[in-house]
Amino acid sequence: GFIRIENATVQIANRIFETRLYNYFLTLPEVQNGEMYKLALRGRNQFIREGKLDMRLLLEKFTVHFDDIYGDRDEKFVEEDGRRYFMLYLKPIINGTGNYYVEARTRNQERTDLIIDYLGTQYIVEMKVWHGKAYNERGEEQLKDYLEYYHLKEGYMLSFNFNKKKEIGVKEIKIGDKTLIEAVV
């Protein structure tokens, strides 16, 4: 079947169905007529440099556009909402050339939030709703572990922070031999 009941909630039963549903919902006219999608579509060529996805620039632009459009929101926001906004922005940029995997499972049964595959290069993105510095540091450590698992040197973290005095932007963090590019919106 398409769905299963787990812990009293309905879940998509299969990763293929889940990806197809994400793709379907991201292609609906009302979604593609939204401001985030249009901004990404207009500027999509700037994110490809020498056949590679410029993830740092993508996060920088996403941060600016998200803050301009949704920055005043303080309503209930969950990690899944952030993933949808980011995927909506990402879709026209990688469309036809790249792909993404949502909550890809590692052999030790951990789940990465998003893996982008663009022309054979993988980019791991961890997304979090801000719940304080300690929680954020655990997310950074989790991303470092994913990078270790996938034998990558650089990973990306996107934090959705709804504090009034947050510092919006993109910064680089070194953890051992890994580089984390972290965006805060």
Regions from the PLM with identified roles:
Residues 1-95, 113, 119:
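C-terminal leucine-rich, beta-strand-based interaction scaffolds used for sensing/assembly
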Residues 173-185:
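Intrinsically disordered, low-complexity terminal regions enriched in charged/polar residues
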Residues 129-135, 156, 182:
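Conserved RecA-like P-loop NTPase helicase motor core
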Residues 97-103:
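Conserved RecA-like helicase motor-core motifs
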Residues 104-109:
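A short beta-turn/loop motif at secondary-structure boundaries
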Residues 86, 114-116, 120-131, 146:
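Conserved catalytic cores of phosphodiester-cleaving nucleases, focusing on short active-site segments
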Residues 136-140, 147-176:
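Nucleic-acid nuclease catalytic cores
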